Amino acid sequence: MAEERPGAWFGFGFCGFGQELGSGRGRQVHSPSPLRAGVDICRVSASWSYTAFVTRGGRLELSGSASGAAGRCKDAWASEGLLAVLRAGPGPEALLQVWAAESALRGEPLWAQNVVPEAEGEDDPAGEAQAGRLPLLPCARAYVSPRAPFYRPLAPELRARQLELGAEHALLLDAAGQVFSWGGGRHGQLGHGTLEAELEPRLLEALQGLVMAEVAAGGWHSVCVSETGDIYIWGWNESGQLALPTRNLAEDGETVAREATELNEDGSQVKRTGGAEDGAPAPFIAVQPFPALLDLPMGSDAVKASCGSRHTAVVTRTGELYTWGWGKYGQLGHEDTTSLDRPRRVEYFVDKQLQVKAVTCGPWNTYVYAVEKGKS
């Protein structure tokens, strides 16, 4: 089989502040569009109003409500309140700089600190594009918070491998593949079976014994992917972002009633209304307070996941992209603005003979890295 050709980044969804989303004009892009500098980009981090791109040469470029550029960058993490930048130092240390988003890369940063990596060689040896490791710091003993204090230490025994932040909660994946969550829980996004908040990282007991490979935090929902390719999802389902039946889409005529089993027993909040073909009430799930197993169409195995504010994107082992949830700005990539409460494959990449390798969601948009499929 021939080697894969160099890939490129694509974007779709909300771009009302002029952030780079390919060739689209106006406030939104409904279908994947190549980014102008997509070949050189290796990391993408998107907030609501701007996006940070890091190139393979270490150049950081901002697009949208925040603008500017800087060199010697290893990683960047964008949020509405601040921009965190990891810059290469003269030795093994890296320099972490935190800027207010409105004055990013201009003047002095709000805060800066030297960071010593825990181990060398943590980046992908093949140089494959990734969404980046921030907000977890290279030392794996602390992370960056969008609210002061910006530097948040982690207990050493957590042995963090990945950390993701939602609007009010945090998810941590440790070296053993176990998941911890903490923060606000009013939408069930912590996965502990209640709507209570947690001040400290708490092991997700429902997944204990299962080895997870990746976690993703949406605005108020959570996803994790196991090493065997299974997807577990929980939290708020207001726009169908959990791929479970939701009242909002049913009222818009954009969903169909489906049979659900043991919905009450698994702890989810179920609301029922009339309308099923057999006359029985149709089940709708508003909040799923602990992990539910989600099957993709055709039994596809997942390898990567990312969440927007109210939408979800998953990459399969065969390089296909599935999206669902809120689609008002085209962030699902299906050439329309329909919201979905079930996974749907993004046909653009199939039609173009592209294999998706990475996905990273902003609150209202989506960025995808894909390569041309190798030819036998």
Swiss-Prot record:
RCC1 repeats lie at residues 6-56, 176-227, 229-317, 318-371. One of its GO terms (biological process) is chromatin organization. SUPFAM superfamilies: RCC1/BLIP-II. One of its GO terms (cellular component) is cytosol. The modification (3R)-3-hydroxyarginine is found at residue 141. It comes from the Eukaryota. Residues 1-169 are annotated as: Interaction with KDM8. Signal peptide: none annotated. The keyword Repeat applies. It is found in: Chromosome. Keywords: Chromatin regulator, Chromosome, Hydroxylation, Repeat. Plays a role in transcriptional repression of satellite repeats, possibly by regulating H3K36 methylation levels in centromeric regions together with KDM8. Possibly together with KDM8, is involved in proper mitotic spindle organization and chromosome segregation. Plays a role in regulating alpha-tubulin deacetylation and cytoskeletal microtubule stability, thereby promoting cell migration and TGF-beta-induced epithelial to mesenchymal transition (EMT), potentially through the inhibition of KDM8. Found in a complex with KDM8. Interacts (via N-terminus) with KDM8 (via N-terminus). This is RCC1 domain-containing protein 1. It comes from Homo sapiens. The lineage of its organism: Eukaryota, Metazoa, Chordata, Craniata, Vertebrata. The gene is RCCD1.
